Amino acid sequence: EYELGKDDSPDILFLGLSATDGVGHDNGPHSFEQLDNHLRLDKYLGDFINSQEDKLGKGNILYILSSDHGVLDLPEYLSEQGIDSGRISRAVRDSIFSITMKKIRSQIGNGKIYRYENFFYFDHSMNGAERKVATEILKEELINIPGVDSVVTKYELLKDGNDNISRRLKNMVHINKSPDIYLILKKYWTWTSKRGTSHGSPYDYDTHIPLIFSGGNKISKIRSDYIRSVDIAPTLARILEINYPKDIDGKPFLIK
């Protein structure tokens, strides 16, 4: 329909294989359901690749496979391996949230703090003293939620940190739009309270993703150097000899 590869101009086709995300959320990465999904996906991709190479010839197509995030193993699976892991009880969380908000209201009045999911926002009308009181109460109470590692302000996250975790936390903060208070979970813990799993933490299991460049007459090689997902676009631009803005986050890397 789109006549891909029919002329001298390169064509770029994006495919979102999103079922893998849903299956992983519901059943975990090591589940039989995910295994079945991967086996079927592998076959579908193989059929697709073969059909395209039959039309255009081998070596004329470059395939790039990656992911937008990793995932946490099921906490139950990790616990069986002797790893401290768990789910945040929604009932316990909501109870502590309720107690905390009542304490804050008793100190500074109503309509000053807003909660969205597990994040807390301060009303712009709050003065410095009110912010200090609210922050102290939030830190004192929310740390009692089992599985919470720390309760921090966005300004604390923006402080320089040399380790990967601090850098990742800092990168997720927008000074004007981000929550004022963050709850950082312990490693291997999740807000998913009943079943399945999730992602979104700064830990390696959530941030480490696969990246495969295949085809295009490239030599097979496994690399262990540090590459970021934002490096994919400028790398592809370099391969296609396309100009790209130099002030973007990503940097091209060599494919040998």
Predicted stretch roles:
Residues E1-D8, E53-G57, N171-H174, P202, ...:
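Surface-exposed acidic, glycine-flexible loop patches that form ligand/cofactor-binding
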